[in-house]
Amino acid sequence: MKGEAKKILQGNQLAAARLIRLLEDAEPKGIQILKALYPHTGNAFILGLTGPPGVGKSTLLAHLITEFRQRDLKVGVVAVDPSSPISGGALLGDRLRMRKHTEDEGVFIRSMATRGHLGGLSKTTKEAVLVLDAMGYDVIVIETVGVGQDEVEVAESVHTTAVVSLPGMGDEIQAMKAGLLEIGDIFVVNKADKPGADDVVDQLRLMLDMRTGSDNEWKPPIIKTVAIDGQGVIELVDAFSAHRQYLVETGKFDERNVEREYQFFRRLVMEMAADKIFDNLDDLPAYNDLITNLITRKVDPYTAAETLVKGIQCKI
């Protein structure tokens, strides 16, 4: 156990890949190793790259890695992919996405399947980020699966969220307002060489101007890029750096760390508590009667849940 943790702290990528696989499969051994690694985490700058399908996130990310490496920063990537309906594994392999970086020891790329988890992330994204953090990567990028407005979960997992759009989206920019526009720290208009790019910038700027906030709050920049040839990538990395500096100077960097850890802790408590509760209920007649009444619609799900919680509270 200690040997595996030591290998990961030394940056062993094979050991890290094995651990992430154990965590994806919810193996107790993996959790024990992660417990040993946890005191060595909390140092990485964690970025989220999100946006609707087809905006070029993966191509943009490949150039971002190059620019971060030119600045002598080690980069870890968690690329969340759709799940195979047969194997449950990621449909897109990391070598297909960012092939040229696979031989760079300063880069570690891990594709993870959503496995039915909503919100644009894999259920074990947070665990994978902790592993990369413990390995000493300076920057960790989470690329979401690309399901559009439902990807707001990424904002709870990172320090800085970049939302990518492109010309020709039309009404989709309006649809983003209730979701992605609310969580973005940086906005990227990719394929900016296409007609309509300036119109998208104007739409985004208009919507961002409608966001309320104090004069001292961060004003999200809008960066135009052409990911296929790397245009605008330097400006985007500069924007990431500027936002990090803003977070550190205002104390919000530590605040976001605390919030991330609290949400992770809360998720684990909810999962463990639910498992423990239902494991102990199966043989209770009152519980079986409650489920029967729910199935036959003699009681609604809300009332059934309230009844169950009240019963648990009485026993605590």
Which stretches of residues belong to each language-model region?
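Short hinge/gating elements
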Residues: K2-A5, M112, F187-V189, P221-V226, ...
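Nucleotide-state-sensitive switch-loop elements of NTP-binding domains
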Residues: G3-L47, V55, L64-D150, S157-V164, ...
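P-loop (Walker A) phosphate-binding loop of NTP-binding proteins
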Residues: P52
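Hydrophobic positions on the alpha1 helix immediately C-terminal to the Walker A/P-loop
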Residues: L60
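Alpha-helical scaffold elements adjacent to nucleotide-binding pockets in ATP/GTP-utilizing enzyme cores
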Residues: L91, A128, E153, S157, ...
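Conserved Switch II/interswitch segment of TRAFAC-class P-loop GTPases
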Residues: E156-Q174, D185, V189-D198
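Canonical P-loop GTPase G-domain recognition
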Residues: I186, A192-E249
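Long, well-ordered amphipathic alpha-helical subdomains in the mid-to-C-terminal portions
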Residues: K224, E235-I312
